[in-house]
Amino acid sequence: MSKQILILPGDGIGPEIMAEAVKVLKRIDAQHGLGFELVYDELGGAAYDKYGSPLADETLERARAADAVLLGAVGGPQWDTIDPSLRPERGLLKIRSQLGLFANLRPALLYPQLADASTLKPEVVAGLDLLILRELTGGIYFGQPRGNRTLDNGERQAYDTLPYSESEIRRIAKAGFEMARLRGKKLCSVDKANVLASSQLWRAVVEEVAKDYPDIALSHMYVDNAAMQLVRAPKQFDVIVTDNMFGDILSDQASMLTGSIGMLPSASLDANSKGMYEPCHGSAPDIAGKGIANPLATILSVAMMLRYTFAQADAADAIERAVGKVLDQGLRTADIWSEGTTKVGTVAMGDAVVAAL
């Protein structure tokens, strides 16, 4: 079996955190005899600087040829003034859509060692373990028509479109039920069906799919209520399935329940579990080059990659256990540091995880 992984370090802290993730990947590869081939390229601002495009055609072909893609982060202020169609984020949107990565998995898992890092009371978040499944290739981020125009009265107007087809909803709903079946058998579908036509179709199709999953407890929630409930009582949720924009917002909100977005991995999968894996956090240009970024989200993204694309659960478990051991040792990067723990940099944290494997 081909086991080629395309490594895209990206922008900002991307290259720093990726170096640590690759260190862990190489160690686990050697320990488990997995035989990965690593191929390197650029995405985002780094790709724009090198190729004149945030996603070069040859990079896309490499991504198609690979079994999985591991990404650092994209974006930075130095590209804010270029043509919007060439911004780093457009490369990320394009690679997701071109690879057919329609399902984005964002876990929010609270490590007991970091219970104090959450801004919520420990009793509200203790034992938190939820998964947000976000539809990734449809909805308002891709909908046409979109644009700007000047009205007859001279006023500027901008507009976007939020379309969803039945097939797009059906496949993400099916993925949601499948994930719920692997976990706590509870699925909450989040929409805005009291206002949006797209959400009304969403809810109807989710209900249809539910008939094939009688063992899963399905509930529906409006997105405004879901945002409130995530803060009020987050442990009521097991798997949340929602559209592109709602999922974008709710998954970032859920990430802070855990205390640091620097701890959270994500996976974007196609229909065959080929995927792109990346940390939930951004490129953090304000700390780039300082050696203080938290590499654990990227390292845990490697674990997700091993679990979902390569079906190497033992190797994935080993990485997750190693991260737990490092936290038990009291090692913390600046974003998760608290009194009584030891502050370490990016490289030292990566080395500690390798040593714990």
UniProtKB/Swiss-Prot annotation:
SMART domains reported for this sequence: Iso_dh
SUPFAM superfamilies per UniProt: Isocitrate/Isopropylmalate dehydrogenase-like
Segment forming the signal sequence: none
Catalysis performed (reactions): (2R,3S)-3-isopropylmalate + NAD(+) = 4-methyl-2-oxopentanoate + CO2 + NADH
UniProt-listed GO biological process terms: L-leucine biosynthetic process
Domain of life: Bacteria
Keyword annotations from UniProtKB, A to Z: Amino-acid biosynthesis, Branched-chain amino acid biosynthesis, Cytoplasm, Leucine biosynthesis, Magnesium, Manganese, Metal-binding, NAD, Oxidoreductase
Pfam families: Iso_dh
Record-stated family: Belongs to the isocitrate and isopropylmalate dehydrogenases family. LeuB type 1 subfamily.
Name this polypeptide is given: 3-isopropylmalate dehydrogenase
